[in-house]
A protein has these predicted regions:
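N-terminal secretory signal peptides that target proteins for export/translocation
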Residues: 1-13
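Intrinsic disorder/low-structure terminal segments
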Residues: 7-9, 23, 59, 194
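Alpha-helical and His/Cys-centered functional microenvironments
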Residues: 8, 19, 74
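Bacterial N-terminal signal peptides
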Residues: 15-28
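A short aromatic-anchored loop/beta-hairpin motif
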Residues: 31-214
Length: 214
């Protein structure tokens, strides 16, 4: 795993969040991803994708990915076990250009994948809802708005959350090919894993829960 990103590098990324968070609105999450893809189990939306122990791509060694999109047009997921740094809640409010009453403490930032490294994604528990909120599978949601970051900084946000920059993406048929090569296992999504405070054990725990050896 790469070394933690220093705050001096995190802050410029957070400053760009307002401009790039709109990327989420381009994701076709509103349409049902239920098409038979010709891969075992069909769509993996709402599932965990777990790197096989033999994974030789350094970007995905021991990666656990929450799949938020998977249909005939391709696939998109967020790596949930790559923490890269922390930012104080006060600095978070500054980064998104707002004022408020931040609580003490820091927010961990994750590397969500190697694509669009400046794109911000907020995964969170489902009791929190805004007009922009999209349900992934009824257990985890995603909100495309800096307002969720403000609410998190002021302890008014979701009970559980994960803020990541970047994502893992596959073109049409690409993920299916990797599945047939046995590069990945799958497991049912579990908020206890997605929001686990002990990131170092997520891959091992996910492997213990794997439901399908592809």
């Amino acid at each position: 795993m790469k070394s933690r990103m220093p705050a001096s590098r995190l802050m410029p990324i957070l400053h760009r969040l307002l401009g790039v968070v709109a990327l989420l609105a381009l994701l076709p999450l509103a349409r049902a991803a239920t098409t038979d893809l010709g891969a075992p189990g069909g769509s993996l939306r709402g599932q965990l994708l777990i790197a096989a122990p033999e994974m030789d791509d350094p970007r995905f060694v021991h990666a656990v990915i929450l799949m938020v999109q998977h249909d005939q047009g391709g696939a998109l997921g967020i790596i949930i076990n790559r923490p890269v740094g922390e930012v104080t809640y006060a600095d978070l409010l500054k980064a998104i250009g707002t004022t408020g009453s931040p609580v003490p403490g820091k927010l961990r930032i994750f590397a969500g994948g190697p694509v669009e490294l400046n794109a911000g994604f907020v995964l969170h528990s489902t009791e929190y809802h805004r007009p922009e909120t999209q349900q992934i599978d009824g257990k985890v949601a995603m909100t495309a708005s800096p307002d969720v970051l403000r609410d998190i900084a002021e302890a008014k946000g979701p009970k559980k959350s994960l803020v990541a920059f970047g994502y893992a993406g596959w073109g049409p048929g690409q993920l299916e090919s990797e599945l047939m090569r046995h590069d990945w296992f799958t497991a049912d999504e579990d908020p206890a894993l997605v929001f686990d405070d002990d990131r170092g054990l997520v891959w091992k725990d996910a492997m213990n829960r794997r439901s399908q050896a592809l």
